[in-house]
């Protein structure tokens, strides 16, 4: 009998856990190390999503374990009006490594919280309240962040915040605007903002965007799009908020994804990867915006704002990423992963597209590669076969597209682990077809 079949465990889970989306895997995870998690039977499962797209250093990295132990023993939590060295040091480090002009940081706990703080700041500083995002976005499950999230969770909970607008994200695999046989995503952006201008009451405060929309199906903003988006914002007195929860801290082959585009947002939000799986988030903005927000009485007082222990973790994460060259490694290992996925694409017609950047890649599963008809159900079947073989994969499927695997192994992943994951994925596809 499998130790995962613990009747008491599953009875208690059914009776006492609130279900918050999706279904639970039918196994009990007992420990994790590096690129693997281990169930109650000791079976190793290769984690190709870094937990919740967060554990960029792998699970239980020894230096992170060490710093947690150190600060749990001497300085864990403080009254929010007190400061500690890890907090000031992390804010200083973030100012030094983010694009020039982003000089002041607020340290928080989760991605939703950081986006909430950013949107609140944008509304206060601009004196306006309308927020625009992408129709395939995910920015969090709290108030303003949920109102700016369009990929899921909008039904059954009453109205979103007044002034919430969405435009389609540019999707090169499934283009909507074509000119002379080519996708004209800048014309699409022009048209989208024309519609926004017609709906706006003149109170456009900010646009919030992910450089690569992860929950939206690994939709990468094409070259030139982010710069054009920034110009749209500037022309309307809007702030540009970039949510780099998943793309930040080296995952895409630059420290921050916006650096590829040479675009500096007005507010940058970080979470997931900043704490490498621990609850740490931040917003980073300019001195001018922070000064104006402070003058206007900006308030974002939370229980765990400026907590020293997670700040110390964030510092150590950045130390390891920079010391071990993990940003460059994301490019090298990402190229290996991409080549392997393209090889699988040659073997299996159900793979319609391979996309993404660095170690954040997407694989879209289709019924017909020529027509790009979505293959409803096949992606979920492949996912189940992956888990049966010992590979943890995550798939998302929005209306109008096939299931998309979001592949995001740790930046510390080895060549052998990349190759193992590719082999298991190939076997899973064979079983599912």
From Swiss-Prot:
Q: Which Pfam families match?
A: Aminotran_3
Q: Which domain of life is it from?
A: Bacteria
Question: What keywords are assigned to this protein?
Answer: Decarboxylase, Lyase, Pyridoxal phosphate
Has the keyword Lyase been applied to this entry?
A: yes
- Which reaction is this enzyme known to catalyze? 2,2-dialkylglycine + pyruvate + H(+) = dialkyl ketone + L-alanine + CO2
Q: Which molecular function term from Gene Ontology is one that the record holds?
A: transaminase activity
Named cofactor requirement(s): pyridoxal 5'-phosphate
Q: Which residues carry this modification: N6-(pyridoxal phosphate)lysine?
A: 272
Q: What is its EC number?
A: 4.1.1.64
- The leader peptide range reads none
Q: What class of enzyme is it?
A: lyase
* Quaternary state and interactors: Homotetramer.
**Any extra remark in the record?**
The enzyme may have evolved to use the rare dialkylglycines of cosmic origin, or it may be part of a metabolic pathway for breaking down cytotoxic peptides and the constituent amino acids.
Q: What does this protein do?
A: The dialkylglycine decarboxylase is of interest because it normally catalyzes both decarboxylation and amino transfer. It may be more properly described as a decarboxylating aminotransferase rather than an aminotransferring decarboxylase.
To which protein family does this belong? Belongs to the class-III pyridoxal-phosphate-dependent aminotransferase family.
- What is this protein identified as? 2,2-dialkylglycine decarboxylase
Which organism is this protein's natural source? Burkholderia cepacia
